[in-house]
Regions:
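An N-terminal assembly and electron-transfer interface module characteristic of large anaerobic redox
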Residues: 1-434
Length: 434
């Protein structure tokens, strides 16, 4: 094996097309390298919103993790957080459980025991199971129904199946469906909207809130801003849903099928002209014309302030951050900056950005974090002087890094403005150290 990290250029990828992506870029075609750069990204309990933390987005919910010790232990970090220290419970599986499946009979009893010991009755119990039960073929829906009979509150499955990560319904897609499956039909209100997609709120200064108010919306629901289970239930009063992340698409379709709430899908973008077009299209659907000039101007001014302090910016863009690495890289190139390297997972949805990158920056190198040859990655000679994403920061430890992986979600013009303000701050901090 050659001792250098495998990559393809944007031009090579675009020329071959989506059907001929090199096997090195498809994690299901080779051994997975758990790069230290992506440990938080790979571990469902380590950082950000993995399956376990996401499963507790419903107010007053608790979670029972049914797993061998090796699968459950990475939850200990989340359990130490004040808002979660009394919401995680464990049912440990031993070898006999795995061979015989006897743990399935223990689950309803465990759920009842947990609910009896809680000071406040939980709103819902999420049962998180792992690849072990995927391989056993466990019918978790049936197990949850048995548990519901014992406690008389909703019990829902939560699948932490790494095996399904590249399937039709990956774990983070399924957990979103589970979260919203608890909503009961209610009378619709014309001035209520749900924002679906994230497990934490948009940044408070996101223009989305004010633009929706321009359209006559009075109430904007986000699951993470619901104070209690009763407020969470009012999400079923929405006139329509805005889907802000593609992993919430299945959940939105469930909304439409069960609760007759239609949805409009938007993308998180870092190109200001594309953001403008997206809001304009949304306004046309809603029958309004959004006044978005002040927000766009603030974002573009932040880009120009950054350009003044770092006109020769040369970026490495990773995937462990709040954004699509290929769309963000394209935005940076269109703003006039260099992007020599991207670390990302190629999908049908983001391949369109690779095609555009191939036209503007054909020599940009694309690496896969999970490809084993990343063990030999060498940053020397890359020309990178600034990084975005935790993984990119790992590969280029001597360069300023914007981790850009905060819980509060950057979106729209506010996301662009905040990103470039952060980058400006990082560059100035490096100058002070020098």
């Amino acid at each position: 094996m050659k001792k250098e990290a495998y990559f393809s250029t944007a031009e090579e990828l675009a020329r071959g097309g989506l059907e001929t992506i090199p096997p090195q870029m498809i994690s299901g075609k080779h051994l997975i390298y758990s790069s230290p750069a992506t440990l938080a990204f790979n571990s469902p309990g380590a950082e950000g919103f993995g399956v376990k933390r996401a499963g507790l987005a419903v107010p007053d919910s608790i979670m029972l993790i049914v797993a061998p010790g090796c699968c459950g232990r990475n939850t200990s970090l989340i359990s130490s957080m004040p808002e979660y220290n009394d919401r995680f419970f464990y049912l440990m599986m031993d070898e006999t459980d795995i061979v015989t499946g006897r743990h399935l009979k223990k689950i309803p009893k465990a759920v009842k025991e947990i609910c009896d010991c809680c000071e406040k009755k939980p709103s819902v119990v999420m049962i998180c199971i792992t690849c072990v039960d995927a391989l056993l073929g466990t019918d978790m829906e049936r197990v949850c129904r048995k548990a519901e009979e014992k406690v008389d509150i909703p019990v829902r499955p939560c699948y932490m199946y790494a095996l399904t990560r590249e399937g039709r319904k990956p774990p983070m897609v399924h957990v979103r469906q589970s979260l919203y499956s608890l909503l009961e039909p209610q009378k619709k209100k014309g001035n209520v909207v749900n924002l679906l997609g994230f497990f934490s709120p948009l940044v408070d200064d996101c223009e989305m809130y004010e633009l929706l108010q321009q359209a006559g919306v009075k109430t904007i629901h986000e699951i993470s801003r619901c104070k209690d289970y009763e407020e969470y239930q009012t999400m079923s009063q929405a006139n329509f849903n805005l889907v802000l992340h593609p992993e919430a698409r299945f959940a939105a379709e469930d909304f439409h099928d069960r609760l007759k709430i239609p949805f409009i899908e938007l993308r998180r973008l870092y190109q200001t002209d594309k953001i403008e077009n997206q809001y304009r299209a949304l306004g046309q659907v809603l029958g309004v014309s959004f006044d978005q000039e002040v927000y766009k101007k603030a974002a573009e001014e932040a880009v120009e302030r950054f350009r003044e302090v770092c006109p020769d910016a040369s970026f490495a863009v990773g995937e462990c951050m709040n954004g699509d690495p290929f769309e963000l890289a394209l935005a940076l190139v269109r703003y006039g900056f260099q992007v020599p390297e991207i670390y990302g997972t190629i999908t049908a949805e983001n391949f369109v950005y690779i095609r555009h990158l191939a036209e503007l920056s054909p020599n940009t190198k694309v690496f896969s974090n999970m490809e084993p040859t990343m063990l030999y990655y060498d940053p020397s000679g890359s020309g990178v002087n600034l990084t975005i994403g935790k993984d990119a920061g790992y590969y280029h430890r001597d360069q300023p890094n914007a981790v850009w992986n905060q819980d509060r979600q950057p979106y729209g013009y506010a996301g662009v403005r905040r990103l470039f303000e952060t980058l400006t701050e990082k560059v100035l901090q490096k100058g002070e150290k020098v």
